[in-house]
C-alpha cells in the first residue's frame, strides 16, 4: 500500500537541548502533584497566549483540523509564498520585569527535508522583534525557546510577523518570570497547563436543550438540520469552521456530484437543489461555491440555532445513550454543552460516534467479509486520500515565486506542467486520515509548492508560467474517507451490483463505485510518497440506501449522514459524493421528526414507523418550485430496472 513512512527523525532532542533541560525524562514523568504545584506557579508568574485568540489575526488563518491530535487550534500564515499581514493582540502581564518566552510551533517540512524551513516567523513585543526566528526546529509540535525579554509595562502588544508566506504556524506563546522554568512537552501536562493559565476556558456553559443536535456543517449536516427544523424540531447545528458546506465550501472547493430527484422518492434532493451552487468545477474561484447561499438558508430557519467555529470533542453518556455533546470554540476556547434526545454525526470522521463508543470500521475489508469481488484478499489500512487542490491565474506582468531550498527533489520528469490541481492531487492513502492528517495535508502543500517553484524557476518551459501566480491553494484538505460507523445494516458491493433493494430504502445513490488508488505513474516517481491518484469506476443502477445504514447499531440515539455511514469501503465509493450525502441529511432530519412524534429512537422508526418516514420522503423538505440547477457532474449510471 502507499505510505509516507520514510523513517525520518524529528528534532525533538535538539529542542530539548536548546531548552537546557537537566532531565527531560523526569519532566515527562511529572506526577499529578507536580502539575498542581505548576498550576499555582502559573497563575502568579506566567502568561499563556493562545495564538488562535489573537484579537487581530491579520492575514493568519485559524486551523482547527488537528486539534484533537496536537491539542489546540493554531494560527497559520497561509500566504502561498507571500508573507501575510501581522497578527496582533494585547497581553496583560502580572508585573513588569524579565520573562522567559517560549513558542509552541513546528518546522512542518522537516519530515521530508533538512534544507532550510518554510514557515519562519518572528514574535514582536511592542514592535520589537524577539531575537530567535521561530518555526525552524522540530518536525513535531514542540516548544521553541525565545530567550528572555524585558517587559517595561504590564500591558504589551504582541505580534506574529510572517517571514515567508509558507504556512508558518503558532499554537501558543508562554511567558514565565521564572528564569529556570521549562514548559511541559507531555500532552496531558500541557493540557493541564492550558487549563490552569486560562481558567475561563474550563467552565462548560449550557448551549441549550434541543430536540435534535447535528454535528458537522457539510452538505449532509446542513441538509439534516434544515430538514428537521422545517418539520418543527428545535435544532442545533454545530460546525467547526466559519462557513458551511464542508468539501463544497470555498475552503475546499469540490463541486457537488451525483443525481437527485430520483425514484422512488423524487422529491428527495429538493433541499440539495435549493442550497447547492449552480456552477460546476473543482478548484475554481471563491464565488462558485456560494457559501452565502448555504449560510442564508440556515439562518432563515427560525427553529435552527447555528454554532459556527465550535468543534465538538466530548460526549456525556447515560445508559449507553448520548446525553449531551460538548464543543469548544476554536478561537476563544469557550465550551458549550448541547443536550438532546437525538444526535446526528455528520462530521465525516465519525467523531461523535467514536467518542460515544459506537462501533466503526476503517480501511479495506477483505473480500470474504462481505463477499465483494472488488475488495482485496487481505484486509488492510488503505483508504482513499485527501486532496489539496490549487489553481493559478494570469497576471499582466511577470510574477516571481521563491526558489525554495526546502522543496522536494524535482526535475523535468517529475514536473506537472499545470496551472490547476484537481481532485487527483490526492495524498495520504495508507496513513491514518485522522491521527496523521496534519502530515497528510502538509505533504499536499509541499508537493504543490515544490512543483510550482520548479515550474517558475527551473523548468525548460518556465516562460509559459512567467505571468502566472498562485491564486488559491487549499489549506483545508478535502477528505474522502476515514471512519465509518456501523449501523443495523452494512451496505456492500453485492447490494449495489445485484440491485438488492430493501424495504427500508431511502436516499438513492447513483454515482459509480468510484475508488481511488495511487497513480502508478506517480508511484514510479515518488515510491511510497505519491501525491496523485487514479479513480476506478464501476457503474450501478441508482440504489436506495437502507435506513438501517443511517443510525448506529449500539448507540441508540445516534444517526449519521455523510461519508461516515454504515457501508463497506467498496460501497463508500458510490455513497460519498455530496448530492447523495445531502439527501441522506434530508432523510435523517425527517427521521428525527418521526422519532419525536412517536417518542422513539431511529431503530423504532425502522421497526414500527417507517411508513411515516416514507410519507415525508415522498413530500420532501426542499422547495419543489425552484429551477432545477443541479444538472452538472451527475456521473455515469446504469438505467433503472423495470419494475
Region locations from a protein language model:
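N-terminal Rossmann-fold NAD(P) dinucleotide-binding loop
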Residues: 221
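Flavin (FAD/FMN)-binding glycine-rich loop and adjacent Rossmann-like elements that form
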Residues: 199-202, 206, 247, 309, ...
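Extracytoplasmic
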Residues: 43-205
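Conserved N-terminal/central alpha/beta ligand/cofactor-binding core
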Residues: 233-234, 239-318, 361, 384-392
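Beta1/beta-strand and adjacent pyrophosphate-binding region of the FAD-binding site
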Residues: 206-218
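Bacterial Sec-dependent N-terminal signal peptides
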Residues: 1-43
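Aromatic pocket-lining residues of Rossmann-like dinucleotide-binding sites
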Residues: 228
Amino acid at each position: 500500500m502507499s505510505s509516507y513512512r520514510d523513517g525520518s527523525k524529528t528534532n525533538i532532542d535538539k529542542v530539548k537541548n536548546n531548552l537546557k533541560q537537566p532531565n527531560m525524562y523526569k519532566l515527562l514523568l511529572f506526577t499529578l502533584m507536580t502539575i498542581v504545584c505548576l498550576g499555582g506557579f502559573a497563575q502568579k508568574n506566567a502568561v499563556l497566549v493562545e495564538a488562535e485568540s489573537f484579537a487581530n489575526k491579520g492575514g493568519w488563518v485559524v486551523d482547527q483540523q488537528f486539534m484533537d491530535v496536537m491539542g489546540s487550534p493554531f494560527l497559520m500564515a497561509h500566504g502561498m509564498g507571500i508573507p501575510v499581514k501581522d497578527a496582533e493582540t494585547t497581553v496583560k502581564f502580572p508585573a513588569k520585569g524579565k520573562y522567559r518566552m517560549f513558542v509552541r510551533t513546528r518546522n512542518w517540512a522537516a519530515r521530508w527535508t533538512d534544507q532550510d524551513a518554510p514557515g519562519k516567523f518572528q514574535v514582536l513585543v511592542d514592535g520589537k522583534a524577539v531575537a530567535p526566528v521561530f518555526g525552524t526546529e522540530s518536525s513535531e509540535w514542540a516548544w521553541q525557546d525565545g530567550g528572555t525579554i524585558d517587559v517595561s509595562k504590564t500591558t504589551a502588544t504582541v505580534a506574529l510577523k510572517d517571514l515567508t508566506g509558507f504556512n508558518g504556524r503558532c499554537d501558543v506563546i508562554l511567558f514565565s518570570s521564572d528564569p529556570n522554568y521549562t514548559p511541559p512537552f507531555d500532552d496531558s501536562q500541557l493540557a493541564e497547563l492550558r487549563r490552569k493559565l486560562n481558567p475561563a476556558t474550563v467552565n462548560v456553559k449550557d448551549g441549550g436543550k434541543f430536540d435534535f443536535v447535528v454535528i458537522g456543517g457539510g452538505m449532509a449536516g446542513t441538509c439534516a438540520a434544515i430538514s428537521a427544523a422545517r418539520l418543527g424540531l428545535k435544532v442545533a447545528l454545530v460546525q467547526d469552521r466559519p462557513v458551511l458546506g464542508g468539501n463544497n465550501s470555498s475552503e475546499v472547493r469540490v463541486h457537488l456530484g451525483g443525481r437527485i430527484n430520483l425514484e422512488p422518492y423524487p422529491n428527495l434532493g429538493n433541499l440539495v437543489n435549493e442550497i447547492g451552487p449552480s456552477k460546476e468545477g473543482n478548484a475554481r474561484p471563491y464565488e462558485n461555491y456560494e457559501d452565502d447561499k448555504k449560510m442564508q438558508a440556515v439562518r432563515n430557519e427560525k427553529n435552527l440555532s447555528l454554532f459556527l467555529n465550535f468543534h465538538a470533542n466530548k460526549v456525556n453518556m447515560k445508559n449507553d445513550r448520548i446525553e449531551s455533546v460538548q464543543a469548544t470554540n476554536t478561537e476563544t476556547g469557550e465550551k458549550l454543552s448541547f443536550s438532546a434526545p437525538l444526535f446526528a454525526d455528520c462530521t465525516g470522521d465519525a467523531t461523535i460516534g467514536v467518542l460515544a463508543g459506537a462501533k466503526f470500521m476503517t480501511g479495506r475489508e477483505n473480500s470474504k467479509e462481505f463477499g465483494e469481488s472488488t475488495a482485496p484478499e487481505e484486509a488492510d489500512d488503505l483508504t482513499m486520500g485527501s486532496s489539496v487542490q490549487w489553481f493559478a491565474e494570469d497576471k499582466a506582468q511577470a510574477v516571481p515565486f521563491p526558489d525554495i531550498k526546502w522543496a522536494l527533489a524535482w526535475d523535468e520528469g517529475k514536473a506537472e506542467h499545470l496551472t490547476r490541481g484537481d481532485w487527483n492531487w490526492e495524498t495520504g492513502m495508507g496513513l491514518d486520515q485522522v491521527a496523521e492528517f496534519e502530515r497528510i495535508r502538509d505533504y499536499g502543500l509541499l508537493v504543490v509548492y515544490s512543483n510550482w517553484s520548479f515550474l517558475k524557476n527551473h523548468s525548460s518551459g518556465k516562460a509559459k508560467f512567467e505571468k502566472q501566480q498562485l491564486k488559491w491553494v487549499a489549506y483545508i484538505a478535502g477528505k474522502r474517507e476515514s471512519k465509518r460507523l456501523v449501523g443495523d445494516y452494512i451496505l456492500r458491493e453485492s447490494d449495489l451490483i445485484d440491485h438488492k433493494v430493501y424495504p427500508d430504502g431511502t436516499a438513492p445513490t447513483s454515482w459509480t463505485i468510484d475508488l481511488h488508488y495511487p497513480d502508478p505513474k506517480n508511484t514510479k516517481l515518488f515510491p511510497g510518497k505519491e501525491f496523485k491518484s487514479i479513480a476506478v469506476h464501476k457503474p450501478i443502477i441508482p440504489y436506495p440506501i437502507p435506513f438501517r445504514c443511517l443510525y448506529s447499531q449500539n448507540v441508540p440515539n445516534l444517526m449519521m449522514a455523510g461519508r461516515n455511514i454504515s457501508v463497506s469501503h467498496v460501497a463508500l465509493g458510490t455513497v460519498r459524493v455530496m448530492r447523495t450525502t445531502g439527501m441522506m441529511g434530508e432523510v435523517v432530519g425527517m427521521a428525527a421528526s418521526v422519532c419525536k412524534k412517536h417518542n422513539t429512537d431511529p431503530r423504532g422508526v425502522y421497526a414500527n414507523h417507517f411508513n411515516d418516514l416514507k410519507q415525508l420522503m415522498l413530500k420532501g423538505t426542499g422547495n419543489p418550485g425552484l429551477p432545477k440547477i443541479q444538472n452538472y457532474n451527475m456521473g455515469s449510471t446504469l438505467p433503472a430496472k423495470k419494475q
